[in-house]
Amino acid sequence: YDTATGNLKNQLTDGTWVAGPVTKIDTIGRKMYFYGYGREKGIDPYYYILYEAQLDRPNAVRLLTPENASHDVSISPSYRYMVDSYSTVSQEPVNVVRNRNGKVIMTLEKPDLQPVYEMGWKAPERFKVKAADGVTDLYGVMWKPADFDSTKVYPIISNVYPGPFFEYVPTRFTINDVYNTRLAQLGFIVITVGHRGGTPMRGKAYHAYGYNNMRDYPLADDKYAIEQLAARYPFIDATKVGIYGHSGGGFMSAAAICTYPDFYSAAVSSAGNHDNRIYNKGFVEIHFGVDAVSYTHLRAHETLMNL
């Protein structure tokens, strides 16, 4: 936009994908560098992918980091080079230097994680299932016990957070996801999975799914995701299902066991905002609307009868 007149000068991106954070603007070379999600077929729509756009040409977007992984890029002051560290939850970080065109010109040192593996640590696994509509793809991560035995059957616990700003579903490699990893070592399959309404990273329709529904929008997707995983993997015991979360996850876990008491066996709710009508009106009205018909109050009364 022209800052003096407010008039649109150029539309830099277009299409059914999401343009994310701007990392750098080259005012001399007339280029903008930014992360995007969901543009490339076959690449996880949650991965941070770096693009270059021309400030003076509409929709002149160039992919700079093509690997199917989440990228963290630092661009040099001269814009001639960039350092890229990319990974997935199960792929160790790869650190490279690229030229301005995205071509890898040097591979930097790799981390030595052999001592961690020798201690019994295992990377989690990313999975994909369908939402309760049977159409929308949902993405999640699964942790297993270090002594996992595929011939045994394990209870499953879902670590939840309803959004709407982000989904607590890791995309990058780490050995420090302590809560899920520790819980798995107690003999559980632990998952966290995204759901409709959880994040703007999947586009407007996905993000706005929870509008006019302050509480129930994520519940059916979590339940259906677990049912699909149990049907896919015989080592999951679908009769022993737990759910837990903090803050929004606290309200979601409590709402889930009250809504589906015959499905969830146990729930742990930490610091839940159980009535969004009286919690932080600013973000609630922006993302969920105004509860003019007291829908939340009526549904709360109905579901609490399941206690």
PLM features: residue spans?
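Hydrophobic beta-strand positions in blades of beta-propellers and related beta-sheet-rich domains
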Residues: Y1, Y48-E52, N95-V97, G140
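Multi-bladed beta-propeller domains
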Residues: Y1-I28, Y37-G42, A53-H71, R100-K130
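Extracytoplasmic/periplasmic beta-strand context in beta-sandwich domains
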Residues: N10, Y48-I49, P93, K204
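Serine-hydrolase catalytic core recognition
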Residues: G29, D72-E302
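Generic short beta-strand segments
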Residues: Y35-G36, W143
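Short, solvent-exposed loop/turn segments at conserved positions within beta-propeller repeat blades
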Residues: K41-Y46, T88-Q91
